[in-house]
Structure formats: C-alpha cells, structure tokens
C-alpha cells in the first residue's frame, strides 16, 4: 500500500492537545517520511466555557464536536483525542482507527504544601474538574472541601499557586506529557482514585468512508491498551456513562488476564457501588458489559435512576 501524500490532523489548541497531536505527527512521520503532515488547531466549546462544570454544559463531547466537523467537511483527515474525552458511542460516519499505548493512567495529587491527601487538614479546599474524582474524594475524605476547577493544565496549576486551593487532582498523563511531572506530590493508586474510562490513552478518529486513512493509522494501534479501553468503555456505555454520572473504570492485563474495576457513586460520595471482574483480554467488551450488570444489581441502578 502506498504512503499518504498529505495528512491534516485536527486538534484542540490547548498546550496538552497540541503536544498529543505533535506526538502522533512524529509517529506518523517515522512511518511515512515523505508525507506532508500538518496540524489544524481548533478552539472547541469545551475550551471556551470555563466558568461552568462539564457535567452542567453537556459533557466532554464538547471537546470533540468541532474536530469531527473538520473531519466531516474534509478540512482534516484525522483527529487526535484523549480517550477519556471520547463519548461512549462514536457518532455515525466516524471510526476510531487506533488507540495508542497508554501513558500513566493514574490521577495525580498536586500540592505546594502537602505530600498526600491524608495530610490535608480538615476544611482544606481540593480542586477537581470531574464528578468521578469529586465523589471519590467526598466518600474517602469527607472532612475536605471539594470545589470545581476548570481550564487547561497550566491554568489549574496557576490557580493552585495563587492559593485558591490547598491541592488539586489532575491526570498524571497530562502532567508527564508536558514535562510537569515534577509538580506531582503523589500518584494516587486506583484503590484511592479509580481513573476515568480511557484515561492516559489517545484515540485517532477518522471518517469511516476513508479506508486508506484507517489502514495507515493501524501501526499506531496498541492492542493491549485497546483491550483495556474497550472493556472500560463497554462498562461505561451500559451504565449510561457521561460527565453527569460519577463513575470510574480501569482495566489492566497481567499474565494474560484482564482485570476490570469499576464504580458508580452519588455525587456527594454518600453511596458508592464498586466491583471488579476478570476475563480474557480479547473478551474485554463482554467483561465490561457483565461488570456493568453486576454493579446495577448491587445498587448502581438506583443511583443512575436518581441522576437521570
């Protein structure tokens, strides 16, 4: 198969999104050195509305709709997303051509004065952007105050440095990609803060009527990561996962066994239903669906109905 002549990559214009797009561009140039590969930077609604939490303005799909429009009208050939921002059902006309190898999937505790959540005194203000993190914090550390925190990585760090928060919780992957890993006070184990579905992985989206482009992206696909992310997304899909639902899902493969952990909680953390399930890596979707059923049977159905 011949190499592509040109590839236009649609990306959000935040520093992290552009890092991710440039990372994919670099990988593609290694594969196709003669190809003209450019980045089309775009500002999305999710980037523009910063004074309201994502759960109240329509969820993370706001970060990718404009990029999909660029694919649809031919301005771009592929779009690069954080998998945790990709809606559980990919719209008709598009396909995820590749899911890249996962960076660190954990959440990171960042503070200038404290080295762990356990050290924070009662009443300390912790900033976070997601209901998932908020519900887990409220459940495990009810003596802390949890407040919304929006904006790009640098904006969030600046708000911490200006004293608005005692600590903030961010995805470790973003900090590491931007060479800000030194800001991490503690990496939170999944037992303390279960990651978001797809956290740490990148997805490459194409038009589904462009089979050549889909084929050209295949070398970037990481099968083990994809198995894990597919299990997480299958669970979330069955639970109606969105920014309005506090849920987490994280799968890992060890010695050819996929272990998926998931939880659903009330936003205030007063109720949390958690479980895990093991299966074959190639059966990730079925493992995810079954874990979702188990969570529903144990009480998640009630929580979801109350949030609907």
UniProtKB/Swiss-Prot annotation:
InterPro entries xrefs: HemC, Porphobilin_deaminase_cofac_BS, Porphobilin_deaminase_N, Porphobilinogen_deaminase_C, Porphobilinogen_deaminase_C_sf
Biological process terms in GO annotation? protoporphyrinogen IX biosynthetic process
Q: Which domain of life is it from?
A: Bacteria
Q: Name one GO molecular function term.
A: hydroxymethylbilane synthase activity
Q: Which PROSITE patterns match?
A: PORPHOBILINOGEN_DEAM
What EC number(s) would the UniProt record show? 2.5.1.61
**Sorted UniProt keywords:** Porphyrin biosynthesis, Transferase
The secretion signal range is: none
On cofactor binding, the record's note says: Binds 1 dipyrromethane group covalently.
Pathway involvement? Porphyrin-containing compound metabolism; protoporphyrin-IX biosynthesis; coproporphyrinogen-III from 5-aminolevulinate: step 2/4
- Note the subunit structure: Monomer.
Additional note from the record: The porphobilinogen subunits are added to the dipyrromethane group.
Query: What is this protein identified as?
Result: Porphobilinogen deaminase
């Amino acid at each position: 198969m011949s190499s592509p002549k040109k590839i236009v990559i649609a990306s959000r214009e935040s520093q992290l999104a552009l890092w991710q797009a440039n990372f994919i561009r670099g990988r593609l140039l290694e594969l196709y050195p003669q190809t003209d590969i450019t980045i089309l930077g775009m500002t999305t609604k999710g980037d523009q509305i910063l004074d309201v939490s994502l759960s109240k303005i329509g969820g993370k799909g706001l970060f990718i709709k404009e990029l999909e429009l660029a694919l649809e009208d031919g301005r771009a050939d592929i779009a690069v997303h954080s998998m945790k921002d990709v809606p559980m059902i990919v719209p008709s006309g598009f396909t995820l051509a590749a899911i890249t190898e996962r960076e660190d999937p954990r959440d990171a505790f960042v503070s200038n004065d404290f080295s762990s959540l356990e050290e924070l005194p009662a009443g300390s203000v912790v900033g976070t952007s997601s209901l998932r993190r908020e519900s887990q914090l409220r459940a495990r550390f009810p003596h802390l105050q949890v407040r919304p925190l929006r904006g790009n990585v640098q904006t969030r760090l600046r708000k911490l440095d200006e004293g608005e928060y005692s600590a903030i919780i961010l995805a470790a992957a973003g900090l590491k990609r931007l060479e800000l890993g030194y800001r991490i006070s503690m990496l939170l184990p999944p037992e303390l803060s279960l990651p978001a579905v797809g956290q740490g992985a990148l997805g490459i989206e194409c038009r589904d009527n462009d089979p050549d482009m889909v084929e050209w992206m295949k070398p970037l696909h990481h099968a083990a990561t994809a198995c894990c992310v597919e299990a997480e997304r299958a669970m979330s899909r069955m639970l109606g996962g969105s920014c309005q639902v506090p849920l987490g899902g994280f799968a890992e493969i060890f010695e050819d066994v996929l272990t998926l952990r998931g939880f659903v909680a009330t936003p205030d953390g007063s109720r949390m239903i958690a479980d895990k399930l093991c299966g074959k890596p190639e059966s990730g979707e079925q493992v995810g669906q079954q874990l979702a059923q188990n969570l529903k049977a144990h009480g998640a159905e009630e929580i979801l109905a109350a949030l609907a």
